[in-house]
């Protein structure tokens, strides 16, 4: 029986493009907000576009969804991928439109990108290098990916930082711990690089 990948639908956009990219690399995708479906999924992908607060509130508005994700990922060990704001939601809190609690799976907070140089544009938009750290793991590879964000994940523990990018200074491009991976960039917009990442995610056995 094919493994199932639950793509969490909580009103946070970009579902269709992420779903298409996952199907392109052979995933059996279930788009869902149903806690029982999440509990039985082999893999979980949490997308997200827009503000941290709106995404966090969208998740919390669905009864039992966060608890099901925690049960399947944090307790059950299912491989998890967070994309863009879905990655940021792994943090303890986000500071966009005031402090908002995140999932708290990876210590840190999501802060605005500081524009210290007028030549460096915010939002950080377009293709940029993904430079791996010693904690990258098997899913990530060096390359160029497509970014679109005005806030960044400030991780407390350097061991949780899997990749960096440079935009007027270092920004976290990916975080990882055990079976949890989050990427700030958009794999579904990153052409061959992004499809390769999704394919390796489907093969990942943390």
Predicted segments with their positions:
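Short acidic low-complexity segments
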Residues: 29-40
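Extreme N-terminal starter segment of soluble prokaryotic enzymes
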Residues: 2-6
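Short hydrophobic segments within beta-strands
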Residues: 8-10
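Cysteine-nucleophile active-site neighborhood
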Residues: 50-124
């Amino acid at each position: 029986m094919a493994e199932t990948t639950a793509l969490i639908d909580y009103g946070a956009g970009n579902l269709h493009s992420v779903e298409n990219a996952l199907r392109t690399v052979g995933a059996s995708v279930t788009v869902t907000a149903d806690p029982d479906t999440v509990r039985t999924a082999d893999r979980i992908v949490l997308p997200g576009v827009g503000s941290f607060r709106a995404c966090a509130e969208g998740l919390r508005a669905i009864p039992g969804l966060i608890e099901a994700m925690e049960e399947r990922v944090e307790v059950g060990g299912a491989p998890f991928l967070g994309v863009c704001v879905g990655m940021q939601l792994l943090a303890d809190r986000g500071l966009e439109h005031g402090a908002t609690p995140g999932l708290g799976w990876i210590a840190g907070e999501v802060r605005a990108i500081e524009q210290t140089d007028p030549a460096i544009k915010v939002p950080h938009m377009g293709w940029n290098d993904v430079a791996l750290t010693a904690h990258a793991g098997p899913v990530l590879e060096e390359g160029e990916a497509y970014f679109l964000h005005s806030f960044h994940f400030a991780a407390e523990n350097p061991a949780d930082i899997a990749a960096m990018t440079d935009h007027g200074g270092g920004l976290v491009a990916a975080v990882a711990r055990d079976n949890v991976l989050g990427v700030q960039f958009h794999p579904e917009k990153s052409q061959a690089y992004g499809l390769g990442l999704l394919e390796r995610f489907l093969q990942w056995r943390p």
